[in-house]
Amino acid sequence: MKTYVSLGIGDLFFLDSILTKEEKESISEIYWACRFGYVMEKLMEGNKSYPNLKAQYTIDDEVGKKAMATLDPVAVDFWHFRPDFHPNFETGLKLFDIEDEWNNQNLQTIDAPSMFLDDTRPFQSSSFIKHSKAIDDEYILFHYPTSTRPRNDIASITMDDWDFVDELSKYHRMRVLVIADSTIDVPLSSYELLIKPDIKHVVDLVANCDYYAGCDSFCSILAAKALPKDKMFIKQSPNFTGWNNWLYRAFLPHSPEEVRQIYKQHIGR
């Protein structure tokens, strides 16, 4: 069925892991009503767990920004037209020119926030991990905070964080693959800096890493679908306000107790 979706990349990895096989197979077309739709379109291309997905549609960035400015000027740079907010949803339908599809019940929406909080939806599997390409290497994957997010919205990496990762690297004799979106100084003994690698390659890197460390991001959510708790070190966002069901479930299949051990104010044990 034609499907309307509005979420972030990390949310996609979360959503995919709780959709049933039947739900995945029901999707024939996707309308990505969000800024990074073009990234998710690429992620979904050729995904064998969605065998009936034949077409995907996105909104041009400038078009999305202009439309968002009339709804919520503060959110222009991270525009989205969620189906659970009626004015936003109406705007998204109009931009895709699919009002008739909705009115004729030929379109389904995915209310991701409600699904994320639904305890009756257990972890199923990650199709992205399942269909990733094998990498014959041993390494620690480190995701450095993006330069485009406000500093009060994403973790900062300290020398203590770097020191822990360096010691982990030396102990296991593994190099560290550092993913970043710009040139940064990396105070590690053995590393390779990957600047804006292809998103599908990022998935492969996450799926095959021996350890994951870094900021709370889409990489950390995906890593949780592949690694045991003792091989993950995620640094909290500085605007962390406390534990909640959404946060716990984002890191499924780990239990809330395990998430508390993984997700800390520092990178380390």
What are these regions (language model features)?
Residues 1-101, 201-204, 214, 219-222:
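Active-site and donor-binding regions of nucleotide-sugar-utilizing enzymes
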Residues 27, 172-174, 227-231:
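A short helix->loop->beta-strand "cap" motif at the edges of active sites that frequently abuts
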Residues 53-59, 83-138:
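A nucleotide-sugar donor-handling region in carbohydrate enzymes
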Residues 41-47, 182-191, 222-226, 241-248:
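Short loop/helix-cap segments at secondary-structure boundaries that form the rim of catalytic
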Residues 209:
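An anion/phosphate-binding loop that grips the pyrophosphate of nucleotide cofactors and donors
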Residues 141-155, 159-202, 222:
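Catalytic donor nucleotide-activated moiety binding site of glycosyltransferases and closely related
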